[in-house]
Design a protein with these regions (language model features):
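Short, amphipathic alpha-helical "lid/cap" segments that border enzyme active or binding sites
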Residues: 25, 47-55, 120-131
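Short, low-complexity, polar/charged sequence segments that are solvent-exposed and flexible
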Residues: 25-29, 53-56, 85-88, 112-115
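Conserved C-terminal active-site "lid" loop/helix of NAD(P)H-dependent oxidoreductases
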Residues: 75-81, 94-133
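Short glycine/proline-enriched coil/turn segments at helix->beta-strand junctions
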Residues: 1-5, 30-33, 59-63, 85, ...
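NAD(P)-dependent short-chain dehydrogenase/reductase
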Residues: 1-42, 49
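Pocket-edge positions in alpha/beta enzyme catalytic cores
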Residues: 39-42, 71, 118
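Mid/C-terminal beta-alpha module of Rossmann-like enzyme folds, strongest
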Residues: 53-105
Length: 133
């Protein structure tokens, strides 16, 4: 029925102790290469911010389709490189993977049903959430 549902579209989700993040941490410690996609443009979210956003949707009885990613875009390679620099204060070893000759966009950006400003993180906010310092 109309008005009784919420569809949440998610980008790549990171968490301070999420498997994806811990896999990157392990690769850094073992000096193993990390696959990155330089021509893939993404937006991201963190597990903490996602839970805040869902909490808001439930408490305010919102309905409709929501895109819960960062408000800005970054290349996958730049995001992973910055994440590693912030978490480990060093650069990693990267295996750059090109899946096509053109830029690919894997992003969930809202056109309608926007959340309040304090629940719309940028990718730098997500990087701050994942920092170990």
């Amino acid at each position: 029925p109309v008005g009784k549902y919420v569809v949440i579209r998610l980008p790549m989700i990171f968490g301070i102790n999420a498997p994806r993040t811990l896999e990157i941490d392990t690769a850094i410690k073992k000096d193993v290469s990390i696959e990155v996609f330089p021509n893939t443009i993404i937006n991201v979210n963190s597990d903490v911010r996602l839970s805040q956003q869902i909490h808001y949707l439930i408490n305010h009885k919102k309905t409709g389709i929501y895109h819960l990613g960062s408000t800005d875009l970054i290349s996958h390679f730049d995001f992973i490189r910055t994440l590693i620099e912030r978490r480990h204060n060093k650069s990693g070893i990267y295996k750059q993977v090109y899946t096509s000759n053109t830029m690919r966009y894997l992003a969930t950006l809202p056109k309608e049903n926007k959340l309040p400003h304090h629940l719309q993180p940028s990718y730098t906010d997500i990087l701050d959430d994942l920092s170990l310092r």
